[in-house]
Design a protein with these regions (language model features):
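Glycine-rich NAD(P)-binding loop of Rossmann-like domains
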Residues: 81
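Generic start-of-chain signal for non-secretory N-termini
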Residues: 1-9
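Internal nucleotide-binding/catalytic subdomain
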Residues: 105-106
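A structural motif detector for beta-strand N-caps
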Residues: 7, 13, 19, 24-27, ...
Length: 115
């Protein structure tokens, strides 16, 4: 795990050794960060959030309780191809949101800024 400076990580959180966290990231209780996930400065992951890589998250995003980002898509066309999620800056993901990876080889689910 590439951790810059001192992010605040709750002791019950599980963070992949492949994860890269910016210095001021805050990670709450029972959060899971799985696989190659890059989390930018100012991001907050609240209780029980689950992020699955490949996933890149920009600056100042807030992920509320029970959000899942990066899971395999619920689509018959998906055949376990390498896909992922890219998230911009200043987004808020409220409770229980799910965001799946792209469906076809090399496709990314992309979420821009200020959502």
């Amino acid at each position: 795990m590439d951790v810059a400076a001192n992010p605040r990580i709750h002791p019950t959180a599980l963070i992949s050794p492949e994860a890269e966290l910016a210095a001021d990231v805050q990670i709450g209780p029972f959060v899971i960060v799985e696989g190659p996930v890059r989390i930018g400065p100012g991001c907050v992951l609240r209780a029980k959030a689950h992020l699955i890589g490949p996933l890149t998250m920009g600056r100042n995003n807030v992920v509320y309780d029970n959000v899942v980002i990066g899971e395999r898509p619920q689509h018959f066309q998906y055949k376990d191809e390498p896909t992922g999620v890219e998230i911009g800056d200043n987004n808020v993901f409220r409770e229980n949101v799910t965001i799946h990876r792209g469906t076809t080889h090399s496709w990314m689910t992309r979420i821009g800024n200020d959502n």
